[in-house]
């Protein structure tokens, strides 16, 4: 009986961190997207190594092309809202 009660108390804890993980992901991605570039442009940020969160499939093509062109200049948002970079901090 002592063992069964111990196992029951061990099961609830692992279920707690699970729901706390999903909400933390979007929260960390929201700030960089708003700070790095406009959310209407596609939402890019350093948090997402892929470049953009919203248009991940379509923007992924442009992100790689403007990566060294717009980000390498040190201007960050020189792409004009057409490309994202994951090396300089996320530019749109």
Swiss-Prot record:
Signal peptide: none annotated. Skin-specific. Expression was readily detected in adult trunk skin, adult arm skin, fetal skin, penal skin, vulva, esophagus and tongue. Not expressed in the cervix, rectum, lung, colon, or placenta. Residues 1-10 have a biased composition (Low complexity). InterPro entries: LCE. Keywords: Keratinization. Belongs to the LCE cluster present on 1q21. This is Late cornified envelope protein 3E.
